[in-house]
Amino acid sequence: RALAGLGNAVKGAVDVGVKAYDDYQNTKATEAYNLFQKAMNEKMYGENGIFIRQGEAAFDSTENMESALRDTAEEVSRQLKLNEYAREKLNRNIYQFSTRFMPKAMEYASEQRMKWADEQDRASLDLNFEGLLNNADDRHMRIMYLSTMEKTYNQYAERNGFSPAKKELGWKRVLSGAYSSLADKFITNGNLNAARELVNEDTLWLGGDQDRIRA
């Protein structure tokens, strides 16, 4: 009986020890994931973080996220000297984390590419519009600037998925606005004949722009 009691006591002590060890490893895995999340939050949202970068700096967001996930997991595992059980639990948590944030990084990179491209197109339209006005008296120069504006507008419209009707109307607005400003400049400079020539070309105008100049 004494030996049986001793055996039960030893078994009970072993069970308690196993449970304590399992709990310790579970807690180590939780600690590791806490450190992982803290480090990733800094890499994603801290100074110059993945989701803070703008424009061209954000084009590699997907690759940067992949590297950050891998490097951070290795750093945490090495820092805490996790055993196989704790590493497996950490890896499961990291996998769930990555299934949320990898697609987000891909989407962010795509959004930033489109935003950057749209900004370049708008800047091009503004610069060529300025060139058009600065060379108002040179017909060949005006044609050159307008041609560049049309190409730029077309690629902007295509990138943003404009329908043919929306694309046509949008370009008509750009063209009408450009010629309205051009006519205003002719009038201001006293070149009324040039202003009249523009007004008489019906294909250039949209809505009330033509009537405003005539008035």
Predicted feature descriptions by range:
Residues 1-215:
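Non-transmembrane, interaction-prone alpha-helical and coil segments associated with secretion
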